A protein has these predicted regions:
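Secreted/periplasmic proteins
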Residues: 1-146, 153, 157, 216-220
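Extracytoplasmic
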Residues: 139-143, 153-223
């Protein structure tokens, strides 16, 4: 399993407001992810800066459809996530993976150091305050995403999916596109979206069709 999308950075207000149904501790190396079983090991990558951590999936928790996961404050700090653009890739790691063995060992060593450092006082705003000041000017210009619905082997299958989306949703028809990846791969996408609000609305609208693994993908500048 793999998925790219926007994580939700946990804080207690989300639990109090019932946006998420379970708690995460600040120090946890846990995430909530609805497609994966509790205890599954995952590699989480901040796609924007390529920083990576290994974590485990926690208990089943409700959280907004738009988000592909809920991550602890500790994970967000390790990845240096941008609160306005917490774009991550989540990859399930198989138990027999050599990568897991290496990373788990390294992370255990890091954990001994990290556990000694106070983290309870860190807020989501604190994590990104300095970075936001530097990036404020260019952030809007760099926000450009598409929603990947599915890949198809046959172009007719992809076209049928587009017709289904047009018929059964209220999405802007000009945003529903067919992209040829190769001679045997045709991708149905929505977009592009140049701000988070429009991206989130389209993502929530398409979810009435109950697709299993919709992904949000950073759009290449000239695509």
């Amino acid at each position: 399993f793999s998925n790219t999308g926007f994580a939700l950075i946990y804080n207690d207000d989300l639990y109090k407001k019932k946006i998420v149904s379970k708690k995460l501790e600040n120090r946890d190396l846990l995430i909530f992810q609805k497609n994966l079983k509790k205890g599954t090991k995952v590699r989480i990558t901040n796609v924007l800066n390529k920083k990576t951590v290994i974590a485990k999936v926690g208990s089943n928790s409700k959280y907004p459809l738009f988000n592909n996961s809920v991550v602890s404050i500790r994970i967000s700090k390790e990845l240096e996530l941008d609160i306005d653009e917490p774009y991550v890739e989540i990859v399930e790691i198989l138990n027999n993976s050599m990568f897991v063995a290496k990373k788990a060992k390294t992370f255990d060593e890091e954990k001994n150091v990290a556990n000694k450092a106070p983290i309870d006082s860190i807020s989501v705003n604190d994590l990104n305050a300095k970075k936001n000041k530097k990036k404020k000017i260019s952030k809007t210009a760099n926000f450009n995403y598409i929603i990947k619905i599915a890949d198809f082997y046959f172009i007719d299958s992809a076209k049928s999916m587009i017709q289904k989306i047009k018929k059964e949703t209220s999405l802007n028809k000009n945003k529903i596109l067919l992209k040829k990846i190769s001679n045997t791969q045709y991708r149905v996408i929505l977009g592009p979206f140049l701000n988070k609000k429009s991206l989130q609305k389209a993502f929530n609208d398409i979810n009435i069709l109950n697709f299993e693994n919709i992904e949000i993908i950073k759009n290449a500048k000239n695509s």
